[in-house]
């Protein structure tokens, strides 16, 4: 159950980051008249997702040692990279993909007790 909560926390915080990116993009490209309203909506959604993620993280910390739980959050780097690449069309070079692979391997190795 604790690992499921960690996965949910990672998903919520990654989506929160993407909402912040969307807010920044809206601020940059929308006319001034629409900018505040649309950006505010994305920022509120980001705050909601990150806030729920924080509350669930507190539950995780009640059940897993910090030294086990915290490294699992590095999956956020993987999720944000994938979502940014496929959702925003951001370019991810070969070195970045190698870094992502090493993060996944590191998470696997740390959990192999």
Curated annotation (Swiss-Prot):
Gene Ontology CC: plasma membrane
Biological process per Gene Ontology, one example term: lipid A biosynthetic process
MF terms (GO), sorted A to Z: carbohydrate derivative transmembrane transporter activity
SUPFAM superfamilies: Multidrug resistance efflux transporter EmrE
Cellular location(s): Cell inner membrane
Pfam families hit by this protein: EamA (PF00892)
Pathway of action: Bacterial outer membrane biogenesis; lipopolysaccharide biosynthesis
Disulfide bonds: none
Membrane-crossing residue ranges in chain numbering: 40-60, 64-84, 92-112
UniProt entry keywords in alphabetical sequence: Cell inner membrane, Cell membrane, Lipid A biosynthesis, Lipid biosynthesis, Lipid metabolism, Lipopolysaccharide biosynthesis, Membrane, Transmembrane, Transmembrane helix, Transport
Main location: membrane
Topological category with respect to the lipid bilayer: Multi-pass membrane protein
Protein purpose: Translocates 4-amino-4-deoxy-L-arabinose-phosphoundecaprenol (alpha-L-Ara4N-phosphoundecaprenol) from the cytoplasmic to the periplasmic side of the inner membrane.
Family: Belongs to the ArnE family.
Subunit composition and interactions: Heterodimer of ArnE and ArnF.
Protein name as it appears in the record: Probable 4-amino-4-deoxy-L-arabinose-phosphoundecaprenol flippase subunit ArnE
Taxonomic source organism: Pectobacterium atrosepticum (strain SCRI 1043 / ATCC BAA-672)
